[in-house]
Amino acid sequence: MKIRHLLNLTIGQDKGLMFSKDIKQLPTDTDFLYYILNYDINHEPGTHFVYNNAATYLLCAITQKITGQYFRDWIQKELFNEMGVTLGEWEKSWQGICLGASGLKLKNSDMHKIALLLLNNGTYEGKRLLNKEWISLMNTPQFFTANLPDYIKKQGRCINKMSYGFGLWICGNGTFEYPKTHYFCDGTDGQLLIVSPKDQMVITILSHQKDMNPIYDAIRYFFD
């Protein structure tokens, strides 16, 4: 298993782990690292995609081991201070490892700044903060995800999860029939960060809504 497999969620497990409902069912003193690393690997890493919060947790654990800092504190200092973004509380396991994929408190105005950083290929207000090639790699399809035409018909081109990059869903898969259009992050119950390079536009939404159809309808107004 390599860092690349953690980033594109192809670590080889048959199901995603570390979702909120899963965590609630585990004993409160569960060692999540032991739990993840001893869970069955059913596929060669890099060959099977499944959305999996465990991969992000492992990335946070590795970063904390290397830097000696809590992940939230490290990325705040190394990146977000330069942008005027303030990360709120970020939930951690009882071992002190940042959950990574969930539990972050963040204002919509700050999430919008992150979207602009992606749109501008790693620059913010004219200052280079991230490597342009890295941003390109993030939003390049690394793995195709489903029975694509049916999926598109169900949700519409503007918000389909046709492929996955590094930490980003990508609309389209880069083929002639389904060209890559925009890319996005999608959190539970309506947390969305959408980047459209073609339209030079970003959309960020923070909500708490089980029925996502009204939100999708509003997004289609801009993209369809």
Spans of model-derived segments:
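Solvent-exposed loop and edge beta-strand segments that line ligand/cofactor-binding
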Residues: 44-51, 99-105, 185, 189
